[in-house]
Amino acid sequence: MESMVKKLKQNLRTGSWKKKEKSMKKERWFLENGSIFLKELIVDCNGKSIPIRSFTSSQIRKATKNFDLSCFVAEEGFYIWYKGVIEDRSYMIKRFSEYKVTDYRVSEVYKDIVLSARMSNHNNFLKLLGCCLEFPFPVLVFEFAEHGVLNYRGGITVNGEESLLPLSLRLKIGKEIANALAYLHMAFPKIIIYRDVKPLHVFLDNNWTAKLSDLSFSISLEEGKSQIEAEDVLGTYGYLDPLYFATRIVTEYTDVYSFGVFLMVVITGISVYFTGSDGYPVGILGYMKGLAENGKLNEIVYPMIMKEMTSAQRLQVEACVLLALRCCEERVEDRPKMIQVAKELKRIEHHVLRS
């Protein structure tokens, strides 16, 4: 009996120490993350206040059922998106993986937080509402996107089933993401280059408004400068500008190229790479170029939507593809600026609505 009591006391002491150790860990993470975050935010915002709510780790764990698969939305690189409810309000919750964020990626995590906070006043960026500093890396809390994130073919996936969106909505998404990129390029003294435009970074809210997310690969040019040499080539294969890939030189046209590929995917519903009739992989850019050069854009395959499109709508899809091909010209001098792309897409969208 005495030995059992001794054992129980020992277990209680151990449990108490573990709880204390866990609490100390959370406090250390809070102080470290808070210090870095505050420093970066002050530098970025010139001391201006940006209201961001602070959440506790218990709130985050309860909202996501301790990061359960039932709350899973999407996984991308070194983070996972969850949906969760806190105080009767739905949120998108972004958790960085402490196992996948290597030393050189730590700065990208904080860059994502700071730039997301700065972009929160623009309707086409996913709005950052708060964060929790009680994890190895801050857990971010964003506005809820009811219709989720675009899949690799520019559609949405519901209960495992892919669904392509109506042409009018796909045009709207293209225009809104073009607006978001133009904002990055023009709204600040230092041009911001996004560097990783692709469907998996685009969320849709309850009004089907497109929201660009993940600014971790973004890079700012020096004030008055039009280019910068990056330390590393960051982005997604298939969407990368070949000039940037070869030289590491980043300009606003780096985004224009990636957006061109993005637009082709979203408008046609064809993935960036697909299997050709000969069984070999085909890139969407080469495929579209071939059709355009041979005057066969009318032969574009529209998976699952061909029968639903009018001849007028097909002509508008062709116009979008031709615009996208201009974005992907080899020489940057031959590519339009993002603001020009956004204006052209608005013109095409309005023409479709009248058709």
UniProtKB/Swiss-Prot annotation:
Ranges for domain Protein kinase: 67-353
Signal sequence bounds: none
Protein keywords: ATP-binding, Kinase, Nucleotide-binding, Transferase
One GO biological process term: cell surface receptor signaling pathway
Enzyme class, first EC level, given as a word: transferase
Record-listed ATP binding positions: V73, A74, E75, E76, G77, F78, Y79, I80, W81, K94
Phenotype caused by lack of the gene: Reduced resistance to Pseudomonas syringae expressing HopZ1a.
EC numbers on record: 2.7.11.1
Catalysed reactions, as listed in the record: L-seryl-[protein] + ATP = O-phospho-L-seryl-[protein] + ADP + H(+); L-threonyl-[protein] + ATP = O-phospho-L-threonyl-[protein] + ADP + H(+)
Complexes and interactors: Interacts with RPP13L4/ZAR1.
Protein family: Belongs to the protein kinase superfamily. Ser/Thr protein kinase family. ZRK subfamily.
Name this protein carries in UniProt: Serine/threonine-protein kinase ZRK3
Organism the protein comes from: Arabidopsis thaliana
